[in-house]
Amino acid sequence: LDYVYGPGRRAMNSPAVPALTKVLLEDVKKALTNTLSPGDRLLLVDMDEWGVDVALTGSQKALSFPTGMGLVCASPRVFFDWKDYLRTYWHYDQALDLELAVEAWGLSNRYNLSLGLGLNKVAGGKVFRDVGYPVK
């Protein structure tokens, strides 16, 4: 929620929002004002008290995060029913493997540090001599 401007503030002022939630969010805002940057948001959800069955969260752009960057919280009632849901679900987009993305980034950037230091300084030149690379 946007605590200061826009829909977050209007929602907090709405009579539909329980008074306890307003107090909780105001306390969180006061406690974290100096900790969070202007774009950071924190929302505490008591899933049991609010009757929430499934909650999704993700880094940066909410549901536009890459695979592996999301968190799904499920109540016990829903958690044990996943098998019925998974049989009828298919991903609408090509699934990405975050591990492969990180590995690809590492492979493309692995020599940047060593080349910046100079070939002679990396491992004392021993690694390069062992593979037949001329080292002075």
UniProtKB/Swiss-Prot annotation:
It comes from the Eukaryota. It catalyses: glyoxylate + L-serine = 3-hydroxypyruvate + glycine; glyoxylate + L-alanine = glycine + pyruvate. Its EC number is 2.6.1.45, 2.6.1.44. The lineage of its organism: Eukaryota, Viridiplantae, Streptophyta, Embryophyta, Tracheophyta. Its cofactor is pyridoxal 5'-phosphate. Homodimer. It is found in: Peroxisome. Keywords: Aminotransferase, Peroxisome, Pyridoxal phosphate, Transferase. Induction: By light. Expressed in leaves but not in root tissue or seedlings. GO terms for cellular component: peroxisome. Gene3D superfamilies: Type I PLP-dependent aspartate aminotransferase-like (Major domain). Belongs to the class-V pyridoxal-phosphate-dependent aminotransferase family. This is Serine--glyoxylate aminotransferase. It comes from Zea mays (Maize). GO terms for molecular function: alanine-glyoxylate transaminase activity; L-serine-glyoxylate transaminase activity. Inhibited by aminooxyacetate.
